[in-house]
Amino acid sequence: VKKFVLVALCFVMLFSFLSAKTVEIWSWRTQDEQVWKNVEKNLKAMGKDITINFRAFIPTEYDAKLFLALQGGTGPDVAYIRRLPGGRTQALVEANLIKPLGKTVDYKDFSLGVKNNVTMNGEQWGVPFAIQVCGIFYNMDIFKENGLTEPKTWGEMLEICKILKSKGIDPFFMTAKEAWTLTMQHAMCGVSILGPAWIKRLSEGKVDFLDQDWIYLQTLLNDLKVYYQDGFMGNDTNDMNSAFAFGQAAMVFYGVWGYQTWKELNPDINVGYFMVPPDWEGSSPYAYIYMDGAFALTSISKNPTDALEVLKYTATPEFGTLFTNITANIPAVDGATMPDVPLLIEVTEAGAKNASPYVYWVGSQFTVQKPSLYDDVLSPGMQAMYMGQITPTELAQKAQDALSQWFVPLMKKLGKIK
């Protein structure tokens, strides 16, 4: 019996040792699977015998699954988290579900602006991984075949849409089944149509959501739907990726993260990019950029030592180079070597030179409490507007009613507080 117990104990100890070398990572990004296979390979080559188990979840379900799992004492060692300020990551910090990293991870290769996106209460809560740039991506071959060039104004873009539609080509492929993409469209158009100065005034409470400029933007978007594909309310990003990759639509409102998928589906596609054009020639276009997210150490990690080794590696230019060559995303870490892809160079330049300093979607102060302009107003509201259930003015009223419940500058403007 003693011999059996000893053997069993050895097996338990061996299993514990083996499992302790595994780092489980949860994410909303399915496209990152190969990244972690390469990270594991590189770490092993460095003498660190760490196995990485990567799991990706549906993006719209991810945050709730992560929070509930961590609250229940289960879940990953490393979790993808959203940027700060933002209610979802703030909730993780306030519930002590993730650990600060400032004293254990070297942030010397991150700019202050990027580092600020993971900072709360004077601590860093994650290692940033990507900078995303949004705008209009187009099929260069379709444009060339039809004698089209990148528009400088919204009116020129409408002329392009008319030409394409007259030739039986869908000008835009929209993904209204996924409401978040409609908020993204609204926001990337807003930085060029409204302009950062107007958005700054909104953030200061000098204008509000019933301002005619805000309603005008929503009217432009509502009028644009005649240039979307038939049945666009039932299409999602998977449909869009296939349709755009194989030339079934000329343009998409999207982010640079889509490029990897389009090239995988159709290596021959030639993709161009332009910022959403302003509605008159005297104004400048702007790019909507944001720090996508970060890698965090969870408080329930069963293997924090190896998880930290993984996180330390993700803070290096070597990881940034690996990451961008697989995902075609712009790495958050400085010093990474970008792939020689003209589109990525152009998008990176747009993000560096034309980023709007004021925004109202991801990374904005309008999303840090409930009801959020992103999740609770524009996501369902844009769907309702596109379906004809509400008007642009009624959508503006919904924003006004929601944000005036907690957004202090707006509350002051409306006389709700002093």
Language model: regions and residue ranges:
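A structural signal for short loop-to-beta-strand junctions that line the ligand-binding cleft
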Residues: 69, 77, 102, 107-142, ...
